[in-house]
């Protein structure tokens, strides 16, 4: 999944 934190996007597998 992915989410946005502090203005950047992070993807998690």
Curated annotation (Swiss-Prot):
Gene Ontology CC annotations of this record: extracellular region
Domain of life of the source: Eukaryota
Entry's localization field: Secreted
Major localisation: secreted
Tissue: Plasma serum.
GO process terms (BP): defense response to bacterium
Keyword list, A-Z: Antibiotic, Antimicrobial, Secreted
Keyword Secreted applies: yes
Keyword Secreted attached: yes
Protein name according to UniProt: Salmocidin-2A
Function: Antibacterial activity against Gram-negative bacteria.
